Amino acid sequence: MNNNVIIGTAGHIDHGKTTLIKALSGIETDTTQEEKDRGMSINLGFAYFDLPSGKRCGVVDVPGHEKFIKNMLAGVSGINLVLLLVDSREGIMPQTKEHIDILTLLGIENYIIVMTKIDLVEEEYRELVKEDIREFIAGTVLETSPIIEVDSISKKGLDNLLETIDKKTEDIEAKNIEKNARLNIDRS
């Protein structure tokens, strides 16, 4: 069991990554004035929160815009678990696919799919979006990933998400600190 887990966000722009992390942690990860003015993440954001079991989760909140994919790449190398966010109004979008491709190439295997903004969509439509997600991830490493519905503003579904993260992290082993260290260098 790993008592310290690093979670990364992934997903299309405006699917609620930063809002979810603020709802879970109370920390605003968009820290620059430009990010606030533009209403989107540009740089990596960092936060943390504790799970019901007492495990601490560090979070790397990545930008979802295609122009900032290099920033996303810089942030995901050390994560143990991915929260893949999908807006329940839009479903899988281009950056969702690109983020999945990148994370798959990096060998990341632990995912929770988070359907966001559920307050804006009827349940029947959400079920259709959920079916589309299941079809899209069939045959991939995400195939058995749980899909959790949340509304980050009202905090509906956050307790279920926290419990799911807690359960999912039981199987994540701590990094072997006896191995040779590896330092990823951003060559931009």
Question: Where do the model's predicted regions map?
Answer:
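Short flexible coil/turn linkers enriched for glycine and charged/polar residues
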Residues: 1-3, 40, 53, 109, ...
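Signal for well-folded cores of large energy- and translation-related assemblies
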Residues: 25, 29, 33, 73, ...
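Conserved catalytic-core segments of large NTP-driven translation/proteostasis enzymes
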Residues: 135-188
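ATP-binding Walker
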Residues: 15, 63, 156
